[in-house]
């Protein structure tokens, strides 16, 4: 055996620096053809909003041209926006949801 001293001090653990994922907004865009009631139904179904919240978001988009529906991680935002837009297409409406980075 060797006579050299053994260093028994534990090595400090290096924790990887984790960054929060960037957030994205799902935006509802106003159009002049999709019935308000249908928009509210889609908001309730896809984004699990209450009737009142769905109406408020829908009316905000109607008045201002667009409204923030939800802010979440990119993959979730893109999935929800596509699902909601597809429901509009299936019903024959030009309902449009988009995503954009949260600032």
UniProtKB/Swiss-Prot annotation:
Domain of life here? Bacteria
**Which Pfam families did the record assign?**
ClpS
Gene3D superfamilies listed in its UniProt record: 3.30.1390.10
Could you tell me the Gene Ontology terms of the biological process aspect for this record?
protein catabolic process; proteolysis
* Matches recorded under HAMAP family: ClpS (MF_00302)
Task: Give the family this protein belongs to, as stated in its UniProt record.
Answer: Belongs to the ClpS family.
Quaternary structure?
Binds to the N-terminal domain of the chaperone ClpA.
Function, please?
A: Involved in the modulation of the specificity of the ClpAP-mediated ATP-dependent protein degradation.
The protein's name in its UniProt record: ATP-dependent Clp protease adapter protein ClpS 2
